[in-house]
Amino acid sequence: MADNKINLDNLNMSEEELFSRISNDELSSEKITAPRYSYWQSVFRVFFRNKINVVMLSLLAIIIIFSFIYPAVIGYDAMVDPFINVMDSTAKHLKPAAAMEKFGANIHWILGAGASGESTFDAIWYGSSISISLALICAVINMTIGVVLGAVWGFSKKFDIFMTEVYNVVANVPYILLISVIVLIMTPNFWSMVFALTITGWIGVAYFIRTQVIIIRDREYNLASRCLGTPIGRIATKNILPFMTSVIVTLAATEIPSYISYEVFLSYIGMGLSDMSLGKLIEAAKSAMQTPGWEIEFWSPVAVASIITVVLYVVGQNLGDASDPRTHMS
């Protein structure tokens, strides 16, 4: 084996040229040369590493554009447009080809005409904006109340006794039945539906958060922090909250699609919104089942509602997985 050692005499350099003295700077020695860690940068790096997430986000962007921007661009008026052809009996329940022949070949009639002679395509996207807005508002309210009360529930033993009894009572009341009764008592509009979906919707979130807080609260490092006199607030923000982020995101991923499903189901059985929504469109399309070509009018809003719920669920679940600090090791 060849000798890999370097002979300094052969370099023809003085000792001063070969070596230089480094000053003992205490401040410099304290500096961390490693790149600064950013939690959310790491989250999105892990999230976008999965190509499926990119596809799902693209679909979500298209859904948002057509649900919220498209109706505003075309000037869709929910009080006028759905009834513009209501007096024309020949404009109702038309297939796409018949609708384009009657009204002109454009994007508005690619899914035909509905029960009132309205554009099914335009109505679906306006209805999507109503359903998505309802789901987002309900999710924000229930998640906010549920996370706050769940955290207190998990920390306070006195509050735990009271809330456990409340949970045992509320959890035994059928959720759909409670929503239906509230909607029947109140005027069936957007905000009454929000009230019905949030009056007890937070209790399940709070119970789940309470369970997670108890699990993390009793870990060894948290017990050691409490023994050392660390304030509860600091333990909650530094030791518990970072581990709860992925749990909260994952829980929200199931909450938002579930409220869209509730709205569609309640509207389909005639107990939902009075405003146009995906459920209302599906309920109105039932009357077209005896007419030729009813499949497009009925299954179009069903397909859009299904795509929206699946996309929101997949994006939320994968974002929740990416939020888990254990996935940031690599």
Model-predicted regions and their roles:
Residues 113-118, 156, 224-234, 238-243:
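Short helix-to-coil transition segments within interhelical loops
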Residues 110, 141, 146, 151-215, ...:
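Generic hydrophobic transmembrane alpha-helix motif, especially the helices
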Residues 207-226, 232:
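Membrane-helix/interface signature in polytopic inner-membrane proteins
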Residues 202, 206, 255, 259, ...:
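Alpha-helical transmembrane segments
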Residues 184-186, 213, 261-304, 328:
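Glycine-rich helix-loop "coupling/hinge" segments at transmembrane-helix boundaries
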Residues 129-145, 233-263:
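Transmembrane alpha-helices
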